[in-house]
Regions:
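N-terminal cap/lid segment of alpha/beta-hydrolase-fold proteins
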Residues: 16-57, 299-302
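Short beta-strand element of the alpha/beta-hydrolase
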Residues: 59-67
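Conserved alpha/beta-hydrolase
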Residues: 73, 81-105, 287
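Catalytic nucleophile-loop/oxyanion-hole region of alpha/beta-hydrolase
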Residues: 97-135
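Alpha/beta-hydrolase-fold enzymes
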Residues: 129-131, 135-233
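Short beta-strand/loop motif that positions the catalytic acidic residue
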Residues: 254, 260-262, 266
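Catalytic histidine-centered segment of alpha/beta-hydrolase-like enzymes
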Residues: 293-306
């Protein structure tokens, strides 16, 4: 598939990747009506799903996955859901384990390769509802999960028509290295503070499995993955976790239409997160790499952001 030429051209102030990333995360506020549904998983844990609906009955639904240290209420998620609702799509925003405001039941939490939870969400939607068209949209870490699912799953349900991944670190190891660079120090601090707060709650929940000493040893995202994420989820170490969870290795196997939207000035992404060669060889992968946008920025005048417009434009081709 030829690489897509992007039409995204923001105003001067939003040509800065840093400012776009910060602005969209801190200064956007949305109102959206949603209903929460709790579903139980096969291992005894649960997920909270936040549903928003089209004003008219529809057979179309989008399943939306958030990023690291996010949840279904973040503006970059609810903005997508709201715009989809306005365009006759229902939208179900998934809160990963431990991200909905209620601690999950298990020692392990969510991670960037946890596509088996997405499988159970899809199965739930198929079994309980009568949608004929299902679309997937993953943002950042959620995008990696969507792409991994599409590439590793041998039999995709026929109702899944297309997908989109935004600001997605398809190569987790190299993106982790980018987050540890000085240019991302403020974001790195933000992420590790949030993750450690959750881990402290997990330590009180499972004191025999997490020592207070371990909490003091975690000061970086890599040490968090090395000392908690990896052992809690059955990986040998952080390198093994990154290797088995990254979606880059699965992209050649994808046979569902998917749009990958990664800005060139996204400071979280490494060079390998722009899979030009794979996209050229795989007719199902549409790769759009605008010059601007930052990490989950893509700001436009008005209330709707560029990645939200692109989701509706892309999905509507497969209705």
């Amino acid at each position: 598939m030829p690489l897509l030429r992007s039409n995204y051209n923001p105003s001067i102030i939003f040509k800065s990747g840093f400012f776009s990333t910060v602005y969209s995360g801190l200064f956007r506020h949305l109102k959206i009506n949603q209903d929460r549904e709790l579903i139980y998983l096969s291992d005894g844990d649960f997920l909270d799903l936040d549903w928003g609906y089209s004003n008219t009955p529809t057979k179309k639904v989008a399943i939306i996955l958030h990023g690291m240290e996010g949840n279904a209420q973040r503006p970059y998620v609810s903005g997508v859901a709201k715009y989809l609702n306005l365009n006759n799509y229902d939208a179900v925003c998934v809160n990963f384990r431990g991200c909905s405001g209620t601690k999950n039941n298990k020692f392990f939490s969510f991670h960037s390769g946890q596509s088996d939870d997405l499988v159970q969400v899809i199965d739930h939607v198929l079994e309980k509802y009568s949608y004929e068209f299902i679309y997937l949209k993953g943002i950042s870490l959620g995008g990696n999960i969507v792409l991994k699912y599409l590439g590793e799953t041998s039999s995709i349900p026929t109702q899944i028509k297309a997908a989109m991944a935004v600001s997605t670190p398809v190569d987790i190891a190299s993106s982790s290295n980018e987050l540890h660079r000085f240019k991302n120090c403020l974001f790195h601090i933000y992420f590790i503070i949030g993750l450690k707060l959750k881990l402290k709650k997990k330590q009180r929940q499972f004191p025999s499995k997490i020592s207070r000493l371990l909490l003091w040893r975690i000061w970086t995202l890599h040490s968090f993955d090395e000392l908690y994420t990896s052992p809690a989820n059955g990986f040998k170490d952080a390198a093994d976790y990154y290797d088995k969870s990254n979606s880059l290795q699965y992209l050649p196997k994808i046979n569902t239409p998917v749009l990958i939207l990664n800005a060139l000035n996204d400071s979280f992404l490494s060079e390998t997160c722009y899979p030009y060669v794979i996209a050229e060889d795989n007719p199902f992968i549409h790769l759009e790499t605008p010059k601007h946008g930052g990490h989950v920025g893509f700001i436009l005048p008005g209330k709707t952001y560029y990645n939200e417009l692109r989701a509706v434009e892309f999905f509507s081709k497969f209705d």
